């Protein structure tokens, strides 16, 4: 698709944080000049505050109606999660006449670019987000990929020796979702919906990728009140991770992760994806046998 015919916008999903939509300012500071919409639900008691602060940029959806269409994976009567908002994005994009969009959480402090220099993994803040989003839209237009994402700030702990940095491109898909409106997909599970999406759909042949060199840096999950903070504090990471196990038991399991410091071990429960059981394994071209002439 020619860029002149492209209709792109950024969706920031938020709840109860009208005065703390950090992602909005981060996008503007880092060179994004396009349209931004704040996506909130009608059960948010700060809807009017959002509209005051972001006039003509707030889209309110009916959460109860959206909830009827989601697969949350349980019978808990609690809608304090982002799942319905995520699944509404494609519908909202279609209604707005968008061809592409990026879906973001509201707590991104900045977006960085990782690169190798003098034997170390370095980082600079992205200066032209318009160019980044345009390049990813080009990728979606020329491939059957469903979404391409930024890595998380903590993904490359370990620097050049981190396993994900060596991959360059990973099959996971979290945080910054660049999407094509006519290529929809769904999220599943009350929480950990992003992991459940890319593992379950990965088994069905959907293509989701993370470009590791681009990273979104978030505030600590439980340091920013509102959003999903209360849910995470109430249920912990064990329950969070187990939703993905329920949906994809053949390739996701519960494991502990973390490291040590000052002679102590700091570990927490997290999900672990067995990728060889999750997505099709593509053999490198270097192993191709050349036919004898």
Language model features: what each stretch is:
Residues 109-199, 203, 219:
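Conserved catalytic core of nucleotide-sugar-dependent glycosyltransferases
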């Amino acid at each position: 698709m020619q860029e002149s015919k492209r209709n792109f916008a950024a969706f920031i999903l938020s709840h109860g944080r009208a005065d703390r939509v950090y992602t909005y300012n981060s996008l503007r500071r880092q060179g994004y000049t396009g349209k931004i919409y704040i996506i909130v639900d009608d059960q948010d008691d700060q809807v009017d505050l959002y509209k005051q602060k972001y006039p003509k940029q707030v889209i309110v959806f009916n959460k109860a109606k959206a909830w009827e269409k989601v697969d949350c994976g349980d019978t808990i009567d609690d809608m304090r999660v982002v799942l319905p908002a995520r699944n509404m994005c494609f519908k909202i994009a279609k209604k707005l006449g968008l061809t592409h969009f990026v879906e973001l959480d509201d707590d991104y402090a900045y977006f960085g670019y990782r690169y190798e220099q003098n034997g170390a993994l370095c980082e600079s803040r992205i200066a032209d987000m318009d160019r980044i989003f345009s390049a990813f839209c080009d990728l979606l237009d020329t491939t059957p990929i469903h979404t391409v994402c930024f890595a998380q700030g903590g993904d490359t702990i370990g620097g050049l020796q981190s396993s994900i940095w060596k991959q360059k491109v990973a099959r996971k898909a979290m945080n910054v979702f660049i999407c094509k409106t006519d290529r929809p997909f769904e999220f599943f599970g009350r929480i950990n919906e992003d992991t459940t999406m890319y593992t379950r759909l990965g088994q069905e042949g959907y293509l989701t990728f993370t470009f590791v060199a681009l990273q979104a840096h978030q505030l600590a999950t439980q340091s920013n009140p509102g959003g999903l903070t209360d849910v995470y504090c109430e249920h912990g990471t064990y329950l969070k991770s187990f939703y993905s196990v329920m949906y994809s038991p053949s390739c996701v399991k519960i494991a502990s992760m973390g490291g040590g410091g000052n002679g102590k071990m700091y570990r927490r429960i997290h999900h672990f994806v067995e990728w060889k059981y999750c997505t099709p394994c593509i053999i490198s071209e270097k192993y191709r046998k050349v036919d004898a002439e």
